[in-house]
């Protein structure tokens, strides 16, 4: 075969004419060191704080330290195969996670990728994990309740929509149990829930997901997981990712509840990252900005006004306020609430529920210490009936604690003191509650009414539990319409008081327990 030189030259000319040169400018750098999930990069001149850096193997790192001649970044995911000399690129984007209703009922990781084996996510777009909290003008005061279903909490330490209420206590005092029951109690309230598990065992999280499914609450909940085996970067970012998912509902005029379990582990992960980035350590080796770590997260939990929602949705949603209620959990060491992270979070939040080991071991569950537990804004959100009936409970318990301390030294007690001690013991017994058994407002109100009006005076201490169970079974059977009315309105007047009195009188006269 003979080659024609003219044809070949024509063919080459055609190819040259068709060739399209596309130049792509990107900021490229080189990894100069890798240590425990933190990489140092040389050459990323235009990198921004918090920017995602593209690594080999379809992974990303987040730039946290911007120095004169290098960038310190944390790797999100496995880092064992990264080595010096590898090329990395800036992306010009900050970290975003998928948000939307399609995430409800799903278990996702920090980056929003599903890990429950139920297929791809159906999301409504992406949202930045770091967002500025709503300003003062965009907020509205807290005046609607979030019912946890616990008598001890809803009566003495009420939580409102848009509030931040800290759950604090030693390990094994029922902190997660309280939070999970609060989620289970939102099945029919319309409040969407987000549960963020930070640094926990995978088996523990699996158990939580199973319990939520058993009680019909998973369909209303997003579970965000950063297990103990995952990198410190993912544990540090998990709460912000969960918060972004909760803000989706808040900004559209809906109510959401988010649980951070727990922020102590997030602070430890952040400390690890900061020390590896050679940031100067402070108290307890935490970096100087550990307060800001939690304040910028918890300030995003708020109740926003109707104008904010209308502006955000461009007029699609009108006349509705939105809220994101946060229940951060902090684990203390030997009951020391004066440690660095606990004091920080106590000062940021609007109150705390303090769970005590001694009470837990004594069989008082939830192990709430009513003396130092407080809700700074929840009182305004309480329903009328709960506010009316719960005042005497706190007083009775305070008097009981004071008298119980003195009665240990006094041999003979007068009748009035003996009655107060007896009443206090019975109220303490009445506030005990089993796990996964949240109570409605009407049920709580009836039980508190019985304690407040002296109906427990002739009931033996050992029979308080069976008295309560029999009373609730009796009203569910014979007085369901009244219970329904109280649940719907939460109101309290002479008529309702008379009906409650009539129920208790007839119950004590005709029933046994």
UniProtKB/Swiss-Prot annotation:
Outcome reported for the amino acid change (mutating residue 175 to I): Reduced activity and loss of ATP-binding
* Lineage of the organism: Bacteria, Pseudomonadati, Pseudomonadota, Gammaproteobacteria, Enterobacterales
Q: State the gene name recorded for this protein.
A: atpA
The protein here is known as ATP synthase subunit alpha
* Organism whose genome encodes this protein: Escherichia coli (strain K12)
- Role of this protein: Produces ATP from ADP in the presence of a proton gradient across the membrane. The alpha chain is a regulatory subunit.
**Entry's PROSITE patterns?**
ATPASE_ALPHA_BETA
Membrane topology designation: Peripheral membrane protein
Mind listing the UniProt keywords for this protein, alphabetically? ATP synthesis, ATP-binding, Cell inner membrane, Cell membrane, CF(1), Hydrogen ion transport, Ion transport, Membrane, Nucleotide-binding, Translocase, Transport
- EC numbers on record: 7.1.2.2
């Amino acid at each position: 075969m003979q080659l024609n030189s003219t044809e070949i030259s024509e063919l080459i000319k055609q190819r040259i004419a068709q060739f399209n040169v596309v130049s792509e400018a990107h900021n490229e750098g080189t990894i100069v060191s890798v240590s425990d999930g933190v990489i140092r990069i040389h050459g990323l001149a235009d990198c921004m704080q918090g920017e995602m850096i593209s690594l080999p193997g379809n992974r990303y790192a987040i730039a946290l330290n911007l120095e004169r001649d290098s960038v310190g970044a944390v790797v999100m995911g496995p880092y064992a195969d990264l080595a010096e000399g590898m090329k990395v690129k800036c992306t010009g984007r900050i970290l975003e996670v998928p948000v939307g209703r399609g995430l409800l009922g799903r278990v996702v990781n920090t980056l929003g990728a599903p890990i429950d084996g139920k297929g791809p996510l159906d999301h409504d777009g992406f949202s930045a994990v770091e967002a500025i909290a709503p300003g003062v003008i965009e907020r509205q005061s807290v005046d609607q309740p979030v019912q946890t279903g616990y008598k001890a909490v809803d009566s003495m330490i009420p939580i409102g929509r848009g509030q931040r209420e800290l759950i604090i206590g030693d390990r094994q005092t029922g902190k997660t149990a309280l939070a999970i029951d609060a989620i289970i109690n939102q099945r029919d309230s319309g409040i969407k829930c987000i549960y963020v598990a930070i640094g926990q065992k995978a088996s523990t999280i699996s158990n939580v997901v199973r319990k939520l499914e058993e009680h019909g609450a998973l369909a209303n909940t997003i579970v965000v997981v950063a297990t103990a085996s995952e990198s410190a970067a993912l544990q540090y970012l998990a709460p912000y990712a969960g918060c972004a998912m909760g803000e989706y509902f808040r900004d559209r005029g809906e109510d959401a509840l988010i649980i951070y379990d727990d922020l102590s582990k997030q602070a430890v992960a952040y400390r690890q990252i900061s020390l590896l980035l050679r940031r100067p350590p402070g108290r307890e080796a935490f970096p100087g900005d550990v307060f800001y770590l939690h304040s910028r997260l918890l300030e995003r939990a708020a109740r926003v006004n109707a104008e904010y929602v209308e502006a955000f949705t461009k007029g699609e949603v009108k006349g509705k306020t939105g809220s994101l209620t946060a229940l951060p959990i902090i684990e203390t060491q030997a009951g020391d609430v004066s440690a660095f992270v606990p004091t920080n979070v106590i000062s940021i939040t609007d109150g705390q529920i303090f769970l005590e080991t001694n009470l837990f071991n004594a069989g008082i569950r939830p192990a709430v210490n009513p003396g130092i537990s407080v809700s700074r804004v929840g009182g305004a959100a309480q329903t009328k009936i709960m506010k009316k009936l719960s005042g005497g409970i706190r007083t009775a318990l305070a008097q009981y604690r004071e008298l119980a301390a003195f009665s240990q030294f006094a041999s003979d007690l007068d009748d009035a003191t003996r009655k107060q001690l007896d009443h206090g013991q019975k109220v303490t017994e009445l506030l005990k509650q089993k796990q996964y058994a949240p109570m409605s407002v009407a049920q709580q109100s009836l039980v508190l009414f019985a304690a407040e009006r002296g109906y427990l005076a002739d009931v033996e201490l050992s029979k308080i539990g069976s008295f309560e169970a029999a009373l609730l079974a009796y009203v569910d059977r014979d007085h369901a319409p009244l219970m329904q009315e109280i649940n719907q309105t939460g109101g309290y007047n002479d008529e309702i008081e008379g009906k409650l009195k009539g129920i208790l009188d007839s119950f004590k006269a005709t029933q046994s327990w």
